Amino acid sequence: MSRRRVVQKRPVPPDSRYNSRLVSMMVRRIMRHGKKSVAHNIVYDALATIEERTGSDPLELFEKAVRNATPLVEVKARRVGGATYQVPMEVRSERGTTLALRWLIHFSRTRSGRSMASRLASELMDAANETGSAVRKREETHRMAEANKAFAHYRY
């Protein structure tokens, strides 16, 4: 780690259509090879699909999906005297949101379906209903932390 001064976190500006920082974060995570307009189209199409299928506010459902996929604890590897322990650590809110978005996008990409927008919409709706791969990943992370509770005193 650098011993110089700490780098200031740059604020994420809210997106233009929904005025939401979360949507903006999602767009930035979906973007590949600097093609932000393509990422915008994917996210906006997914939210439009959600509105079409459910008839409710897509932003509300999106926020609920992210909340349901956000982990509260995770395990980190810590080496102590030749042995590596999986130490459970609490997740800060910002990291939790980042992990949730990462998992939602990852499992959207691995889903079967035609377009990325439809796959993302399906994954978001599943996460909002507390099903789907991203929520399962969160529960798996919580189970790992629970199983390794004995090593919690190695926290750093």
Curated annotation (Swiss-Prot):
Pfam families according to UniProt: Ribosomal_S7
Gene3D superfamilies reported for this sequence: Ribosomal protein S7 domain
A single MF term (Gene Ontology): structural constituent of ribosome
One GO biological process term: translation
Record-level GO cellular component terms: small ribosomal subunit
Keyword list, A-Z: Ribonucleoprotein, Ribosomal protein, RNA-binding, rRNA-binding, tRNA-binding
InterPro entries, A to Z: Ribosomal_uS7, Ribosomal_uS7_bac/org-type, Ribosomal_uS7_CS, Ribosomal_uS7_dom, Ribosomal_uS7_dom_sf
Protein role: One of the primary rRNA binding proteins, it binds directly to 16S rRNA where it nucleates assembly of the head domain of the 30S subunit. Is located at the subunit interface close to the decoding center, probably blocks exit of the E-site tRNA.
Subunit structure: Part of the 30S ribosomal subunit. Contacts proteins S9 and S11.
Family of the protein in this entry: Belongs to the universal ribosomal protein uS7 family.
Protein name: Small ribosomal subunit protein uS7
Origin species: Arthrospira platensis (Spirulina platensis)
Gene behind this protein: rpsG
